Every structure is written in structure tokens, then in C-alpha cells.
Amino acid sequence: MAEGLERVRISASELRGILATLAPQAGSRENMKELKEARPRKDNRRPDLEIYKPGLSRLRNKPKIKEPSGSEEFKDEIVNDRDCSAVENGTQPFKDVCKELNNQQQNGPIDPENNRGQESFPRTAGQEDRSLKMIKRTKKPDLQIYQPGRRLQTVSKESASRVEEEEILNQVEQLRVEEDECRGNVVKEEVVNKPDRAEIEKSPGGDRVRAAKGEKGKRIEKGEGMRKTNDDPAQGKPGSAKRYSRSDKRRNRYRTCSTSSAGSNNSAEGAGLTDNGCRRRRQDRTKERPRLKKQVSVSSTDSLDEDRIDEPDGLEPRRSSERKKHLERNWSGRGEGEQKSNGKENRGTLRVTFDAEAMNKESPMVRSARDDMDRGKPDKGLSSGGKGSEKQESKNPKQELRGRGRGILILPAHTTLSVNSAGSPESAPLGPRLLFGSGSKGPRSWGRGGTTRRLWDPNNPDQKPALKTQTPQLHFLDTDDEVSPTSWGDSRQAQASYYKFQNSDNPYYYPRTPGPASQYPYTGYNPLQYPVGPTNGVYPGPYYPGYPTPSGPYVCSPLPASTMSPEEVEQHMRNLQQQELHRLLRVADNQELQLSNLLSRDRISPEGLEKMAQLRAELLQLYERCILLDIEFSDNQNVDQILWKNAFYQVIEKFRQLVKDPNVENPEQIRNRLLELLDEGSDFFDSLLQKLQVTYKFKLEDYIDGLAIRSKPLRKTVKYALISAQRCMICQGDIARYREQARDTANYGKARSWYLKAQHIAPKNGRPYNQLALLAVYTRRKLDAVYYYMRSLAASNPILTAKESLMSLFEETKRKAEQMEKKQHEEFELSPDQWRKGKKSTFRHVGDDTTRLEIWIHPSHPRSSQGTESGKDSEQENGLGSLSPSDLNKRFILSFLHAHGKLFTRIGMETFPAVAEKVLKEFQVLLQHSPSPIGSTRMLQLMTINMFAVHNSQLKDCFSEECRSVIQEQAAALGLAMFSLLVCRCTYLLKESAKAQLSSPEDQDDQDDIKVSSFVPDLKELLPSVKVWSDWMLGYPDTWNPPPTSLDLPSHVAVDVWSTLADFCNILTAVNQSEVPLYKDPDDDLTLLILEEDRLLSGFVPLLAAPQDPCYVEKTSDKVIAADCKRVTVLKYFLEALCGQEEPLLAFKDGKYVSVAPAPDTMGKEMVSQEGTRLEDEEEDVVIEDFEEDSEAEGSGGEDDIRELRAKKLALARKIAEQQRRQEKIQAVLEDHSQMRQMELEIRPLFLVPDTNGFIDHLASLARLLESRKYILVVPLIVINELDGLAKGQETDHRAGGYARVVQEKARKSIEFLEQRFESRDSCLRALTSRGNELESIAFRSEDITGQLGNNDDLILSCCLHYCKDKAKDFMPTSKEEPIRLLREVVLLTDDRNLRVKALTRNVPVRDIPAFLTWAQVG
């Protein structure tokens, strides 16, 4: 406070100069009013706050000067100062002030003790008596306003420049004493001598007045960094502050009482006016209320600002300067210096008046002088913390609002004390209204009269200004947390209130965002208790905690130029906008919580329905406002989905639940409510779509083209707006779908239209495809459902729940396919004679056991064990050919989905070749029909599903480009096979088109080329699918080059893909695609050509890598023919690309294209190689038998050998006898059980499990079985390990060395055979662990069998049992007389008697290899 009050010190010369300058202008009271009216207030702003400028006239630490030697020198100085101020218009005093400021900065930190010493000067007894006499005369509280803390002047320590300072202070004091003696005449003198505003501010006193305004309310005892550097022991305890609470207003413990009314809102005179008892009582009162602060009331000090309305204008400037001077002197002398000075010397009364307008406006010269003074300041710290002028400036706003003086203020006559004098709203008393006014509430503010203190002006007793407007007494709460801003009204920016809880509904919730930007557009409090830097570039940051930020020019005058860059301003405004958006979302969350609680009830009353409608309306308004304010923020916060879920989805589901509830009283009323809600939603989203287009300036018609990649980049806001528009369209489709379900209808055309529009806006989003799949499921179109679910998974942002939906679809398809297969078998078995004939040939009894019956069914025909494959094929072909196109199409779709279900689920892949063969046969027959029953769109869906199967089955963690999984190769083989059949059909149709063109008379001129316009309709239907698959092949060459292993298909179905493509390329070269010219670059008369298949498959991930070059055609050209020309051009480029591969697949030789692709391992070559291997094995068998006979003859000579052989014979005989007894017991048990129930085994051999002896003795036979491609050879891992052990050789007896070498060689050949086949990834060969895990490679074939029960034979048998999945519900008959029927697809191939017996006990079919070869008719 002392720092602020020191600014109002006015020298005598300055005051004399003011009086001399304004003497000619002295006039009547009306002239003063006219002068005041010339400065009107703008927007009800208070002009008394405008004067503040941070960082000016810090004149606290002036150098001290010696006292003048005599009164003559003092008088001469007064005259000189008066002349200077009158002639030079205040220029020199400003230079002196700058000089003093430079000296102050050079002297270092500010010393409060020095300040007191600087302002102390001797006073005479007469002056003291006159001061006391004046105080007694002006004792009434309505005339005097007391400011607390009047200082006692002290003699400070030594200072080099003290003489000059004290000389000025003595002059001011002498002037003040003279004015006290003629109190009654001063008022008139001030009216006459009212100075001009500009001339006042040109003088040094005017500068100090402005400095005092900037420093008002600042207490010298505040515990801050600049006070800590003062080590002067004379300062004492009152000058240092240890507290950091912002609400604790500490006062001088030696503060004296006043002779004025105790109820006044300001303090009394200094220590010289009272005795020690009064001082102690005031100290006690301060201790009792240490935290009372910033009280706002209509008491004496609060009325200062309002009183200025009715007071004479001429009194304002003089009175204002005098009051500031008096308050500065009273405050600057507080502390220890009060005790050291002569307390009875300072008893004069300073009368200071305030001009509400003059205080807030500056003349240009004053502003320039202020700028000069700012420039004259060196960048040195003015505080102990070493802060510069910026820090000091940022501190001034805080100092301004805590003014509390201790002098006596003589209010002029006719002073209006109403709270709305400045035209401010009623909230104005809550903020800092006066320079030393309402913000300076001390402990005495709660004296007699409280906050509604009445003030009377003796000169105008009829007027009672204090009763004009009164504010309610404040309710004080916690004073420690005072960082909340408050509102000032509409006409001014928000300023910090004196107390946080005055007009705040929720004072504890004012969040502040970290960073350079302010939380709100108005200034507030800084929560820190230590000095901080500026918070933004517009307003200087608060320096002290709990103090309001700058008032004055930042409220009432135009804002100064911002130092923030445009980017920072934009970010600042964006932060503010996001805060508003977060607030809206918080409000919406609250509303949604109420709505959810309402919907959670079992029954909803009519009042609840009305409340629900109200909450929904508020939610829609809040969410719509968020979307239209900041579309990017809304997308990040997912406001679109939250809007749909909270305002529509949960309400719709509640109504649907109530409609289905049988206990609901009036379901029709609920249904009508539901339909009204759906209509409301449709209208809302239609409106939102229009508002999005208007707000973000785009048209939806320009973007519903289905392009995933655009030539020109979109604006950021348009991109987000398109995403929001797509979600709105999806919501429209959902509403249309719910409407159909509510009406119990199934016309989903409108919903499908909305979903397709949404897909065209952003094709990479998977949500529209998922919704389209739902519609396909509702309408039982399984192919469409699978297609859209796959599109949903193969999108840039996939819908992962589609995977579960696909799993359920494929499971249902599998059941239907099995039912269809069973139905076909029943149709084949209509003839009972053939069935009995075939049945008798397949029955075989096991020994003499009549209770066990095995029915062996050959895989070539379901009715007979004998039959040819050709007969089966011709019969099935005749059956497919006899079907209608629609029935054939249904059967094909079912088979196609069944095959892809195996590829997707990877279950039942052992039957995939058979299912794929069926798919290809039906597809081939379908293509023969004209017109094609599939259609262009359905054909595109088939190709898309094939692409997805290859894409979905690729290895995720494989970094090698040549690495492909078995599932991926099978999926690629199926796709290429269907593509080859499609290309064959196109080649045939192209030839037909060429023949038709030759027969056409108008095309005889050009017989060599085939015109695109002459294409037959079936060819036009197929070309888009061929083009799309070729695009995929160009984008992913690693999936088909080198070519994958082809499926094992019959010769009439298996087609060489690359030979077919070569033939297609030869016929395609004859097509003239230049019938419609195509252009690469755009032009004014050209238009972009978009193919229908490209638009339909836009956003499909497997096709994103395909080349997508734009193509332009003339606007007048035929778009249909132009599209076919583009397709032909793309196909020609694709076929040329096959010739340009690193390993070319096509080549141009002898004037035509031929296939140069490496031929896969065909069945013929394998047959030849395996036949040669079989002959070699037979020759080796003969040699082995001869070698065994020779070895026996050689070993029969010795007697020891004979005895050993006899002993072995006896041991074997005993062992055989034991086994026979065991077998008899087993047979007896079986007979006992078989008397009650007969068992039938239906054996359809598919999996063949050989043991180790089978590879040693019958390797060639196993190779023939493998080459037949009818069976899958399953090799247990334990058999491979045994073969490895035999191949290494373990000779323990030299006499058996020859046979061991033979066995070792056969085992080695078996291992080589298996490794070769596994390396080539033979689909009919697989390895199986003892736990039932299939292996695609035997590179790692060691198995840990610890914990496995039994020997190796048991492990082999466990592999067979892996394929025997018996379920009681499947084989147990309904009646006791019927036999138990078991289905077996596995056969154990072994000669081991023990293993065969174990297999029979477990109902596992078993045969030796030669017998099975005879039955299977292989070899």
C-alpha cells in the first residue's frame, strides 16, 4: 500500500503551478459541469479506472536530500517550481521523474525504511495544533472518510541524495498546513483554480497521481520478494510479512484510533492522533478479524465513487491529487519508522478530491511523457527478486485494488455516493470501483452501522446519497481460496471480484487449463502464491495471488495491441471453444443419465413420457450444437454415435421391448409412440444433413460417387463433415429398418437405399456394409450377407463383430450342405435292386462273429464297391444338366459358401478338395446357360469373396514374400480355377462375337478387328468380373506367382489357367478398343469415366493396391461402349504384364501367345515315377528273400545255434498259447455282449493310417494309394520317429547284419519319400501327433511322449481314434432290436496281429495293405 500511496506525493511547486495555470479558467459551477460533460462515458464504463498504466513512476526509493537551510530558499524554490510548471507545461518535471527513477533503479531494491525516511520532514507546533483543531471541527463521519494506517514520519539512515527529496516534501507539507488553516476557503479556491486535465498530468504531481492509481491498495507489509531484501533493523517486525494467505490483510500493530466515527469504513489518522490505548484496541480488533477482506458495502468509502456525480466538477482534479498525496504519506510511513519519528508533528489534514473522468483519461502529452519515462527506465529489477519493469508492471494491477489509507479525506460538498453512479450494472459494487474505495475494507468496516452506513453531507443536508442504492450484506465464507472470477455485466469485461463467493453459484469449480492461454476471455485470479509471468499476450499476468488483475485501461479503454501471433490467437480461441464444447457434453451427459434412469423403469407413466421427450429434445439440441460448432472435435469425441445411441437407439429399443411385452396394457399406443419417434428421428437427421452442408459449405451430391481415392484433396472440415453425413445416413437407414419392423413388414428398400448412399460417401468405412449384411440376413439372401460381411471386415476401419456373424452363417451353410448331400444320396438309392446288389457285395463278416457287420463303401460310387469314375461323372453331369437354372444356381451358391466356410473357419479341410470339385462342376455348368443366371453383380460378388478368402488366409507374421500358407494356396487355387473357367467362357463368347461380326453386312469393311459394340450380352456380363480379378492379380503378384499347387480335379474340370489366359490373349488382340477414344488427362470437353465395378468395389482392401489410373472420355460418347473399351484395354495390359514378369508366365512365340508357366506336378508324371519306384522295390524284395534263405543255411551248422533256436521256439510257443487264451477270453466277452445287440460299421475309407511295417514292406503300395488322390495318407509322428531310428542303423549282432542293412535302406527310402512329399506340400499327405495335432511339415518331428500310456502301437491306435468321433445320439438306435450303426472314415493299414486286435476292440477298421489295394482297385 505504501508503494501505491507514494505515487500521489505532490510537491508544493507543482501545486502552485497548477493553481497559477488554472487561475484564468476559474469560473462558475456551471463551467465545471460543462467541462465534465465534454468527457462523456462510453458504454457505461468507469473512467476512473482507465488511468492505470502498469510500470510507471515507482518513486519509492528516491535518494534523500538534506533539509533546506532556511525559509527563504524554500520560498524561492516554490516560486521557481511554479514558474516552471506554468511556462514549460510540465515537461521538466517529467524529466526529473525519469531521472529519479533511474537513480532509484541504480540504488537497487526498494527499501521501505528509506521510503519512510524520504517522506519525513519537521513540522512546527502550530501546524500540529492546526491539524488537531481541524480534525475536531470535521469529526462527522459523513464528511470524513478515514483511511487506515497513517504513517509516522521517521528519520531514516544515511543516503546520498536525501537533501533534494526532503526539500520537496517540506514544500508539500507547508502547502498542506496552509491549506488546513483556511479550510473553508479552499473549496472555493479549488473551484476557481480547477486545472485542466492535460496540464495536471503534465506536471510531476500528475504523474504521481497516476502512479498512485496504479499502486492503490498495495500494502507495504505484504510478504513478497522485494521486502525480503530489506535487512534494515530499523524496519522491525511490522514491516516484514511471513504469511502467504491471500485473504489475511495484515495491518500495523501500532495503528491508531480515529476521532471520527467508529462505524466508518476507513481507518483513522496515524499514531500522532491517538494515544497508546487506542492503538492497542485497534491492534486487538485486527487480531480478532485478521481475514476480513474486500468487503463490499455502501459505507463511507464505497460511496466515494458515487458521490462524484453530484459534486462540482471543478473540485475533482485538485481534490483527487490531494487525497492521493495524503494517503501516500499516511501509508508510506507505516512500520517501525512510526515509532522513531515524532508522532505529534504530522497532524495536518489533506483534502483530496477525485474526478471520475479526469482520473481515467490522459492527454496525448501525458501518454508520450509516460512512454518516454518507460523508455528511460533501464531493464533493472525494482524488487529484491531482481524482477524488471515488466514484473513490476504486472504487479501494479494487484496493488491497485487493495488500497487502504490512514489519512483523513474531506469529501466535497454534494458528493453522490450511489453505487450506480458510473452507470454500471448492479454487480459493479462486487468489483473494484474506486481507486482507494470499496476495495480497501479494513477491520473497522464492521463497525457501527455495518455495510449500510448512512452518510450525510453537511453542505447538502437534504440529499442522502447513501440511501439511493444499497447492496445486501455479503455472506462471507472461506477466504483462503479467492481465485474465482465474477461477472461485471454486459458492458465491460469480467474482472476479479473482491470475494469469490459473492456472485458465484459454484465457487469451487472454475477450472483453468495449463498453458499460455487464459481459461476465459476475461482476467481472473492467479492461484499461485508466488510471482508468475504473464499468462497471455493480451493481459499481463497477475503478480500476487488473490489480487484482481488490472482494471482501468483493460476494462474501459480499447484493448492494447495483442502480442500473440495469429496462430496463438487461433489456438486460444479454439481452446475456449473446446471448453465450451466440453461443457455442452457434460450437460448432455447429465441429461442422458436422467434419460437412462427413466428408461430403466419397467413401466413409463405419461409424465415420464413427457419428461423423456423434454430430455431428448435438450440432448438433440446440445449434440447438434457440438457438431455444428466443431466437426473435428465432434468426430474425436464420437458425438454422432453418442447422439444416436443416447437420443434414439436406447429409446427405440425400450419401445420395441414394450411392444413385444405381453403384459403391456396398450401396445398399440406404444407402437404409435415408436412410430412418432422414428418420424421425428427421420426429420432430425434430414435437417442435420442440410445444416452440415450449409455450415461447412459442401454438397452431398458432389461426393456420392463411390470413390475411395479422389484426385483433389478435401478440406479438413469437409472430410469430417462427410463422415458425419455418412453416419446420419446410416441412422436414416436404421430408422427406416426399425419402421418396417414396427409395422411387421419386410420392405427394406428405403433402408437399403440409405445404406448404399452412405457407402458411396466413404467406401472405406465398414459400417454401411455391416448394416447391408443385416438386411440381407433379414431377407435370407445368404450370398449377399456373406459378401457384405466380408466387405465390412476388409475395410480400412473394419467391423470386427462381422467375423462372428460370418461364423454363424457358415455353420448354417454347412448344415444345409450336409442335408443336401444326404438328399442326393437318397435320390441315387431309389432303385432297391441295385442297392441290394451293392449291399451284398459290401458285406463282410469278421471271422465267425455274426454280431459284427462291416459295410465297406467305395469312394467312387455310393451304391457299389465296384464302379468307374467316368460312370459317376457322367451320371452327375446328367443330373446337373437336367436341373433348371434357378435350382442349379441355388445348389451352386450353397456349395460355394460351403467351400468358403471351410476356408474361413479352417475346419474340415480334409474334404475341401471334394467340395471345391463340386463347386467348379456346378460353376462350369452355370456358365453354359445363356443368358447367365448369375448376373454381373452376382459374379462380382463371387470374385470378391474369392479375393477375400486369399487375403484373409495369408500369414500375418511372415516377412518372406514367397511364404504362403496351405489355406492360402488352396484359396488361391480355387479362385484361379474359377477365373480360368470364366476366361474360357469369355474366349468362347469372343469367338462367337467375331462370327457374328463376319456375318454382319455393315462390318464387312473391317473383317480383321472385333468391335466392342459387337460384344454379345453374355460377354458384357462377364467382362467386369474378369477385369476385377485381373486388377487383383496385378496388385498381388506374390499370391499367384509362382503358381500355387493346383487342386486335384478331374480332367474335364481341371483347366490350366495360364494356357487359358494365352488363348484369351490371342483372341483379345483382335479386339479394337479404340472405337471410343480414351484419354489420360482431363480437359474441358472430357468427363471422367468410372466403371461400375470400380465404384462398387471401391474401398475394398484387397483391391487398394491395384492400379487405378483415371480415364476420360468425350461427354458426347457412349458411356457403355466406352466402359467396355476401357475393360478391354485393362485386360490387354494385364496379359502383357504376365509376359513381363520376372518369371514370365506367357510368351509371344510364332505369332501367338503361349504359356511358359512351370507345369505343376501332374498325376501322369507321378504315376510314371512311382511305377519305376515300385519295380525297383519288388526287385529289392526278391534279393532280400534270397539273402534271408542263404543266411539261414549258413547259420544251421552249429549246435549252439540249434539249442538257441529251440529255446526261442518254446518261448514263442508259450507266448502264442498265452495270446490264444487271451483271445478266447476276449471272444467270450464279445459273444456275451453281442447276444443282445448287433453292430454295423459303415466304412467310407478316406484317412489311411499305416504303421512302420507298412513303410518298410509296402512303400510302393502306399505310393500308389497316394497317387490315386482318393485317400489321405495320415502318418503318425511315432512312425516317422521309428523310421528315423531304423534309417540310422543299430547293429548289435554281426550275424544279422545283412538283414539290418536291408531294413535300414528301406527305412531311409521311406524317410526320403515322406520328406519329398511333405516338402512339395502334398494335400493328400499329413503328419499327426499322438495328441491329434496335424502337421504340414516334418522338419521338426521329435515328440515328447512322456506321460502317454501304452507302447508305440497304442500311440498309433490313438491317431486312428482321433478320426472316430462317436456320439451316442448319432449311433444309438431308438429301439433295442435295431443294430448299432457306426460311421468310420479311417482305416488302419497294418500286418501286426496285436495292433489289429486292439483296433478291432476299439471298432477301428483295419486291413493289411495288399488286401486294401485289392478292394480299392488301385494298382
From Swiss-Prot:
<dbReference type="InterPro" id="IPR018834">
    <property type="entry name" value="DNA/RNA-bd_Est1-type"/>
</dbReference>
<dbReference type="Pfam" id="PF13638">
    <property type="entry name" value="PIN_4"/>
</dbReference>
<dbReference type="GO" id="GO:0005730">
    <property type="term" value="C:nucleolus"/>
</dbReference>
<keyword id="KW-0175">Coiled coil</keyword>
<feature type="region of interest" description="Disordered">
    <location>
        <begin position="179"/>
        <end position="405"/>
    </location>
</feature>
<feature type="compositionally biased region" description="Acidic residues">
    <location>
        <begin position="303"/>
        <end position="314"/>
    </location>
</feature>
<feature type="binding site">
    <location>
        <position position="1392"/>
    </location>
    <ligand>
        <name>Mn(2+)</name>
    </ligand>
</feature>
<feature type="binding site">
    <location>
        <position position="1251"/>
    </location>
    <ligand>
        <name>Mn(2+)</name>
    </ligand>
</feature>
<feature type="modified residue" description="Omega-N-methylarginine">
    <location>
        <position position="406"/>
    </location>
</feature>
<feature type="modified residue" description="Phosphoserine">
    <location>
        <position position="870"/>
    </location>
</feature>
<feature type="modified residue" description="Phosphoserine">
    <location>
        <position position="203"/>
    </location>
</feature>
<feature type="region of interest" description="Disordered">
    <location>
        <begin position="26"/>
        <end position="77"/>
    </location>
</feature>
<dbReference type="GO" id="GO:0000184">
    <property type="term" value="P:nuclear-transcribed mRNA catabolic process, nonsense-mediated decay"/>
</dbReference>
<feature type="compositionally biased region" description="Basic and acidic residues">
    <location>
        <begin position="368"/>
        <end position="380"/>
    </location>
</feature>
<feature type="compositionally biased region" description="Low complexity">
    <location>
        <begin position="258"/>
        <end position="272"/>
    </location>
</feature>
<dbReference type="GO" id="GO:0005697">
    <property type="term" value="C:telomerase holoenzyme complex"/>
</dbReference>
<feature type="modified residue" description="Omega-N-methylarginine">
    <location>
        <position position="433"/>
    </location>
</feature>
<dbReference type="InterPro" id="IPR002716">
    <property type="entry name" value="PIN_dom"/>
</dbReference>
<dbReference type="InterPro" id="IPR011990">
    <property type="entry name" value="TPR-like_helical_dom_sf"/>
</dbReference>
<keyword id="KW-0539">Nucleus</keyword>
<keyword id="KW-0866">Nonsense-mediated mRNA decay</keyword>
<keyword id="KW-0158">Chromosome</keyword>
<feature type="modified residue" description="Phosphoserine">
    <location>
        <position position="874"/>
    </location>
</feature>
<feature type="compositionally biased region" description="Basic and acidic residues">
    <location>
        <begin position="64"/>
        <end position="77"/>
    </location>
</feature>
<keyword id="KW-0597">Phosphoprotein</keyword>
<keyword id="KW-0963">Cytoplasm</keyword>
<feature type="region of interest" description="Disordered">
    <location>
        <begin position="99"/>
        <end position="167"/>
    </location>
</feature>
<dbReference type="InterPro" id="IPR019458">
    <property type="entry name" value="Est1-like_N"/>
</dbReference>
<dbReference type="GO" id="GO:0042162">
    <property type="term" value="F:telomeric DNA binding"/>
</dbReference>
<dbReference type="Pfam" id="PF10373">
    <property type="entry name" value="EST1_DNA_bind"/>
</dbReference>
<protein>
    <recommendedName>
        <fullName>Telomerase-binding protein EST1A</fullName>
        <ecNumber>3.1.-.-</ecNumber>
    </recommendedName>
</protein>
<feature type="compositionally biased region" description="Basic and acidic residues">
    <location>
        <begin position="388"/>
        <end position="403"/>
    </location>
</feature>
<feature type="modified residue" description="Phosphothreonine">
    <location>
        <position position="479"/>
    </location>
</feature>
<feature type="modified residue" description="Phosphoserine">
    <location>
        <position position="332"/>
    </location>
</feature>
<keyword id="KW-0378">Hydrolase</keyword>
<dbReference type="GO" id="GO:0070034">
    <property type="term" value="F:telomerase RNA binding"/>
</dbReference>
<keyword id="KW-0255">Endonuclease</keyword>
<feature type="region of interest" description="Disordered">
    <location>
        <begin position="854"/>
        <end position="883"/>
    </location>
</feature>
<keyword id="KW-0238">DNA-binding</keyword>
<keyword id="KW-0488">Methylation</keyword>
<dbReference type="GO" id="GO:0005829">
    <property type="term" value="C:cytosol"/>
</dbReference>
<feature type="domain" description="PINc">
    <location>
        <begin position="1246"/>
        <end position="1397"/>
    </location>
</feature>
